[in-house]
Amino acid sequence: AVRAARKAGNVIAKHYETPDSVETSQKGSNDFVTNVDKAAEAIIIETIRKSYPQHTIITEESGEHEGTDQDVQWVIDPLDGTTNFIKRLPHFSVSIAVRIKGRTEVAVVYDPMRNELFTATRGQGAQLNGYRLRCSNARDLDGTILATGFPFKAKQHATTYMNILGKLFTECADFRRTGSAALDLAYVATGRVDGYFELSLKPWDFAAGELIAREAGAIVCDFTGGHNYMTTGNIVAGNPRVVKAMLANMREELSDALKR
């Protein structure tokens, strides 16, 4: 997993240096893909297939590549933060998670621009370039920095989202909105941000980051405190006290659509 992430990161970094080599197309509303996403994905798939030809691979750009072993799934976002990459804003990552019978067991998030490799193995903690990670120990929202992402693919939730944001803003110190969900969760794990919330994510956005945050002592849940986020894509993360305070503030602003 680490080898695949580093190889993909090298492809991405090379193209970042030569912007003329990047071709962009639109695949949906406010949703872009580049030849670099596809090249990074291809090298990840090739690396996995070499060692584990029988595993199933699920990727953002090309969907499911079935293997004979349905129990082991690799969930991959070859370039999380494509919009930043296109705009030449150096904040994006490669996200790789290995799920066995539906449980994430191994996770890698790699930031090729900073050469930061976040890794986690279930039950063995999370690391950044080999150093153990612990999430922030904030006791409540006072003074906290919260990360988030706007629902740019689900603008029907814009008003509700802005209400939640406004409510939390009166309690916390400030927000960060950086454009890569995988790195947001990795930053929860390192304590660079105290908490994180976002709605309408896809499994490959957070599959790896979720385990890394958990293994650093964070809890991850949906907007009602449940575990339905794999289906809804609505996610809240942080240490238990921060998450409890975030949920309490969000509760009053949730629309019915976001309570699922």
Regions found by a protein language model. Give the residues of each.
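N-terminal subdomain of lithium-sensitive/metallo-dependent phosphomonoesterases centered on the IMPase/IPPase/PAP
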Residues: 1-79, 219, 241, 248, ...
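Buried hydrophobic positions in well-ordered alpha/beta secondary-structure cores of metabolic enzymes
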Residues: 12, 81-82, 146, 188, ...
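Active-site-adjacent structural elements in enzyme catalytic cores
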Residues: 46, 50, 58, 65-134, ...
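A short, glycine/Asx- and small/polar-enriched loop/turn
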Residues: 68-72, 141, 189-192, 230-232
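Acidic beta-strand-loop-alpha-helix segment within the catalytic core
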Residues: 97-185, 232-260
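Alpha-to-beta junction loops
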Residues: 190-195, 218-219
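Active-site neighborhoods of divalent-metal-dependent phosphate/nucleic-acid chemistry enzymes
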Residues: 194-203
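AMP-binding (ANL) adenylation modules
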Residues: 224-229
